[in-house]
Amino acid sequence: MGCFKVLVLFAAILCMSLLVCAEDEVNLQAQIEEGPMEAIRSRRAACSDRAHGHICESFKSFCKDSGRNGVKLRANCKKTCGLC
């Protein structure tokens, strides 16, 4: 009897994980359909925000002063603030 309860519990957990995975897949598909242009537009909008611009400038100055790791950090600056 105890083994049956464990089996039922395992089946319930498996079903719940499948439902969560299906929901994530739907969200991912919606983002793909939204397209890269929408992502670029939203990033530009974030960059136009004054606070974000300040973060970009601070990050860029940090990258310039970073010494040996500067090349890698500057690449991150371009990724983070390239559209600012």
Curated annotation (Swiss-Prot):
<feature type="site" description="The positively charged side chain either protrude into the micelle interior or reside in close proximity to its surface">
    <location>
        <position position="72"/>
    </location>
</feature>
<keyword id="KW-0732">Signal</keyword>
<feature type="disulfide bond">
    <location>
        <begin position="47"/>
        <end position="84"/>
    </location>
</feature>
<keyword id="KW-1053">Target membrane</keyword>
<feature type="site" description="The positively charged side chain either protrude into the micelle interior or reside in close proximity to its surface">
    <location>
        <position position="68"/>
    </location>
</feature>
<feature type="site" description="The hydrophobic side chain is located at the binding interface of DPC micelle">
    <location>
        <position position="73"/>
    </location>
</feature>
<comment type="function">
    <text>Antimicrobial peptide with modest activity. Active against the Gram-positive bacterium L.monocytogenes (MIC=22.64 ug/ml), B.megaterium (MIC=10 uM), B.mycoides, B.subtilis, M.luteus (MIC=40 uM), M.phlei, and S.aureus, and the Gram-negative bacterium E.coli (MIC=7.66 ug/ml) and P.aeruginosa. Shows moderate affinity to the negatively charged (POPC/DOPG 3:1) lipid vesicles. The peptide interacts with the surface of DPC micelles by two alpha-helical regions. It does not interact with the zwitterionic (POPC) lipid vesicles, which model membranes of eukaryotic cells.</text>
</comment>
<dbReference type="GO" id="GO:0005576">
    <property type="term" value="C:extracellular region"/>
</dbReference>
<feature type="site" description="The positively charged side chain either protrude into the micelle interior or reside in close proximity to its surface">
    <location>
        <position position="52"/>
    </location>
</feature>
<feature type="site" description="The hydrophobic side chain is located at the binding interface of DPC micelle">
    <location>
        <position position="71"/>
    </location>
</feature>
<keyword id="KW-0044">Antibiotic</keyword>
<keyword id="KW-0165">Cleavage on pair of basic residues</keyword>
<dbReference type="GO" id="GO:0016020">
    <property type="term" value="C:membrane"/>
</dbReference>
<feature type="disulfide bond">
    <location>
        <begin position="63"/>
        <end position="81"/>
    </location>
</feature>
<dbReference type="GO" id="GO:0044218">
    <property type="term" value="C:other organism cell membrane"/>
</dbReference>
<feature type="disulfide bond">
    <location>
        <begin position="56"/>
        <end position="77"/>
    </location>
</feature>
<keyword id="KW-1015">Disulfide bond</keyword>
<keyword id="KW-0472">Membrane</keyword>
<feature type="domain" description="ShKT">
    <location>
        <begin position="47"/>
        <end position="84"/>
    </location>
</feature>
<feature type="site" description="The positively charged side chain either protrude into the micelle interior or reside in close proximity to its surface">
    <location>
        <position position="50"/>
    </location>
</feature>
<dbReference type="InterPro" id="IPR003582">
    <property type="entry name" value="ShKT_dom"/>
</dbReference>
<protein>
    <recommendedName>
        <fullName>Antimicrobial peptide aurelin</fullName>
    </recommendedName>
</protein>
<feature type="signal peptide">
    <location>
        <begin position="1"/>
        <end position="22"/>
    </location>
</feature>
<feature type="propeptide">
    <location>
        <begin position="23"/>
        <end position="44"/>
    </location>
</feature>
<dbReference type="GO" id="GO:0042742">
    <property type="term" value="P:defense response to bacterium"/>
</dbReference>
<feature type="site" description="The positively charged side chain either protrude into the micelle interior or reside in close proximity to its surface">
    <location>
        <position position="54"/>
    </location>
</feature>
<keyword id="KW-0929">Antimicrobial</keyword>
<feature type="site" description="The hydrophobic side chain is located at the binding interface of DPC micelle">
    <location>
        <position position="59"/>
    </location>
</feature>
<keyword id="KW-1052">Target cell membrane</keyword>
<dbReference type="Pfam" id="PF01549">
    <property type="entry name" value="ShK"/>
</dbReference>
<feature type="site" description="The hydrophobic side chain is located at the binding interface of DPC micelle">
    <location>
        <position position="55"/>
    </location>
</feature>
<comment type="similarity">
    <text>Belongs to the sea anemone type 1 potassium channel toxin family.</text>
</comment>
<keyword id="KW-0964">Secreted</keyword>
